[in-house]
Amino acid sequence: MKITKERLLQIVNEEIATFSAKKLNEATRSTIAIEDKNGKVRGTYIHSDGYLDGVGEVLAKHYKDKKKIEKLLDLGKAGISALYKSIDGGDDHSFNSPEKGETIFYGRDRGEDNDMTSQFKDRDAFATGHSEEFAYMYSMKDKKWYS
């Protein structure tokens, strides 16, 4: 089968339109964690968009409340595929068909039961002990995110 120049151009333009229409997640791994008032740190794994303009920005804008951060970590015990502003889920939300703006959890949304959490004795141990490209820690004492 011979493809004409016009047909090849049409295929390329369709692919470009498809990429432009979708928000693609990049597998830049990160760890998010919370430091309690005693200095102990607990965290979990996030698979996608771990860079500052991804997970870092979402955390700074939408995760300022201690209870929401703790719920995020609790729901993320089996890991988090992609972090968005909401952690509520919903009847129509699933791993394969996520609702827009909903965080995608491996446990709640895909039924996995892995333990992707980590525990550290203090923030120094967290800083040197995680294995992902990016790490974010919320300090309950300081009431702010560190990266």
Protein language model features and the residues they cover:
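Protein-protein interaction and targeting regions used for scaffolding, dimerization, and localization
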Residues: M1-E26
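His-enriched metal-coordination microenvironments in redox/metal-binding proteins
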Residues: N25-T31, S48-D53
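Short beta-strand scaffold segments in enzyme catalytic cores
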Residues: R29-I34, Y136
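Catalytic phosphate/metal-binding cores of nucleic-acid and nucleotide-processing enzymes, i.e., regions
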Residues: I34, G43, Y51, K68-I69
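Short acidic-glycine loop/turn motifs at beta-strand connectors
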Residues: E35-K40, S139-D142
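Glycine-rich catalytic cores of cysteine/serine-nucleophile enzymes that process amide/ester linkages
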Residues: G43-L59
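Low-complexity intrinsically disordered segments
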Residues: H62-S147
